[in-house]
């Protein structure tokens, strides 16, 4: 693993200030970690075209390097994610830093999906569990709940953005 090249990919822009300390620790541990953002090469006007329409049921939330939170249509973003991952094919591992459900949409042999890891980890710890989940946006409730219900969990969802924290959202 020491000689492995690891790509950490955010669906927003890199570098992500909120992940900088963790990434620095990986580098200090001898790992060859590189950061990439799916939106890195896109102009603000192009990013705006990726906003969800009222018909979009699968919404993703991420950060730009200026700290701005953006809402994105997963369907509109998918070609950009696929291109970014294709460009990184020389990396030993690619970690997509998004908990959206991409298992049926992305099939790269070296791709690590936190969504798949989290649902299987929790399922491995306890097979019948009611769980509370916090997501960035209220309109993510349906897709988040469906994902965890497929893994046979009873889900309660609340929205509070990690990028625009508001304690009132959690009350």
Language model segments and positions:
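Flexible, charged surface loops at secondary-structure boundaries
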Residues: 1-2, 85-92, 106-107, 123-129, ...
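Short, well-ordered alpha-helical microsegments
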Residues: 16-17, 96, 102-105, 118-120, ...
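N-terminal glycine-rich anion-binding loop in soluble enzyme alpha/beta folds
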Residues: 2-71, 135-166
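Anion-binding alpha/beta catalytic cores of soluble intermediary-metabolism enzymes, centered on
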Residues: 104-134
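N-terminal glycine-rich phosphate/adenylate-binding segment common to multiple enzyme folds
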Residues: 71-116
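Short, charged beta->alpha transition segments
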Residues: 82-87, 117-124, 143-145
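A short, acidic, amphipathic alpha-helical segment used as a generic capping/interface helix at domain edges
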Residues: 79-84, 164-171
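Periplasmic-binding protein-like
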Residues: 7-9, 92-97, 132
